[in-house]
Amino acid sequence: MAGAVLAGFAVVPVANAQPPKFPDVDSYPAVDLAEYQVIGAHPSMSGWVFSTPGGLRCQSNMIADLGVSCTGPIVGAATDMNSVAVSLTKPGLIARYEQSPDDHSYPLLPTGSKIAPGNGVVCAVLADDALTCRAKKPDSWPKDTQDPPDRHYGEHGFVVQPSGSWSY
């Protein structure tokens, strides 16, 4: 699911300077996860899907390392950017992604709400045309959880908004 989406990104450099104040995603009310959950044959094919009023279609994976990816109009970015993603192990990425049409229906995440499935990823719809997602170690993990030898856990995120989309 999200892992497959992340594999097809065309890398486009985006400046990742010290981010402006990141929105407080924790202050938004959470939706009922059951309405957004999808179950696949493997945990990497399972997670949560949602759409935004601004036309983004997002997939958050059950496996915390895989994070969340969204496709659709990335307002506030270069005109050909159509994808944004972030995970526990990789900084946010705004990119152009060659994609085949997806005719699946994704439930709407309403403006002023968040989806917080407990996998370390939290996304909130700030306004009809603005989305933010943050990925960090899940609260359920012990504080002393060690990084795997091949990657580093950290806090990463992105903001998609008309005044300028950015990631860290």
Task: Place the predicted regions along the sequence by residue.
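Secretory targeting and sorting signals
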Residues: 1-18
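Long, hydrophobic N-terminal alpha-helical segment
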Residues: 13-16, 33-49, 53-55
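A low-complexity, Ser/Thr/Gly/Pro-enriched, surface-exposed linker/loop concept
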Residues: 18-40, 64-111, 151-168
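Short, surface-exposed binding/anchoring microloops in extracellular/periplasmic proteins
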Residues: 45-77
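Acidic, glycine-rich flexible loop segments
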Residues: 100-141
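Extracellularly exposed regions in secreted/surface proteins, prominently low-complexity, repeat-rich
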Residues: 127-168
